[in-house]
Amino acid sequence: MINRRHALGLFAAASFLPSRSFANVSYQRSEFRDDLAKRFFDLGTVGTFVGYKVDDYLIIASDKVRSGEGKLPASTFKIPNSIIALETGVVEDPDKDVFKWDGVTRSIEAWNKDHMLRSAIAASAVPVYQEIARRIGQQRMQKYLDLFDYGNRDIGGGIDQFWLTGNLRIDPIQQIDFIDRLRRGVLPVSKRSQELVRDILPATKVGDATIRAKSGLLGAEQGKPSLGWMVGWAEKGSQQTVFAMNMDVRDPSQIPARMTVTQQCLADIVAI
């Protein structure tokens, strides 16, 4: 049987995308779909969507170029940050350990209060996760990003900024590879940490399907959004599809479109 990471890696190679640390074993099927690319054109922006129908080893993408371009992960990094926090004991219980508000009033009201890990990931509370990263520290953070083979694994630019304004980059194929391993519980950390993070991921019901996903938005805290992400997986009956979407956000009115266009693309590939 073909390993899922191998299938993703060969998709990257066959698509003439930048090389990654995936083994060179044949994948089964891949498709590029113009109708997915049109979703971004209709929004008046550019972006990419990649869906991975795991039971079929079928990878469906909107393009061959942007799907292999590394970007700052923004708040999608809250997923690995949460795993590392639990694994290192920085957080023991996502529903009990309290991160006190620092008293600084920020433009996003949901950030201006105390949080636990579950509420912090739901509110995408950047200050909480910056404090988590500081408590994890440079050495442990680097250790786990290396273990996860997460993006370019470069945490330069500050322990509380590297995923927002620093050196970390990840592309949609790499996002899918990481998310799929979390979904299956095969990351090189405890089952408990992975189960808890799967449980706290925001979930959205769409008909008889469920989307478990984390958004990201570069520039959110400055009120100057520039890049939007949505990564996660969709469940419909026994069918599961891992996905990653990113798009240029050219106007604040496009911020909600991160989920809208993701749902449209998932529907287009019959994942929801």
Q: Where are the language model's segments positioned?
A:
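Structured C-terminal helix/loop/strand segments within mature extracytoplasmic catalytic/sensor domains
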Residues: 25-37, 70, 134-137, 183-272
